[in-house]
Amino acid sequence: EGFEKTLRSSGRLYLKRPGRLRWDYREPTPEEIYVRQNDVMMYVPEHQQVLVGKLTQLAASQAPLQLLQGLASLEDHFTLQPATGGKRGEGGLPLIALIPKGVDEESMRTVERITLEVQPKSYVLKTVAIHEVGGNVSTFRFTNIQTNTGLKNELFDFRPPEGVEVIKAPTLAPP
């Protein structure tokens, strides 16, 4: 939402504690994102490039990964409140709005709020909507969730195929 047109993508997300994430986009174009602690690699096979960089030091950017992995106390990174208008998700559970903390100057904040919907029986995250200050909304819906499947560390290691250009990204930090 908020973009000139709605962009849809699908894929598979893998998480492992502590601080490991792999996101394989399948549609519309294949991409792979790897996160290990503060290191990020984004591989775009179509362009034969991998972008290598660091997560920002802003709490608003690190907290979603910690949230997905259950590593952080929500109160450390967010002010929790019911979603506006008392909206409810599937099963009647209230949606939760998370307002980022830790950004001293509001002008530097890129995320206005994150809205969460949890599955009624398991309390596993079902939907995460990231509302940006500029009005854009990125909504992630999780289906076919499997927990404690014993993912191997190698799944989160990326080695660029031969001929792939490695590009060092600028540090994603406030000016």
Residue ranges and their predicted role:
Residues A59-E75:
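Short, solvent-exposed helix-to-loop capping segments enriched in aromatics
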Residues E4-T6, K121:
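Edge/loop elements at the starts and ends of beta-strands within beta-rich repeat scaffolds
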Residues R12-A63, S138-T139:
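An acidic-aromatic
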Residues E1, D24-R26, Y43-P45, I99-K101, ...:
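A generic structural motif
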Residues A173-P175:
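Short, solvent-exposed mixed-charge patches
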Residues E1-F3, Y14:
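A short, Trp-centered hydrophobic/proline-enriched beta-strand micro-motif
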Residues L7-S9, R17, E27, L74, ...:
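Residues that act as N-cap/strand-start positions at coil-to-secondary-structure junctions
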Residues S73-G163, I167-K168:
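Gly/Pro-enriched, hydrophobic low-complexity segments
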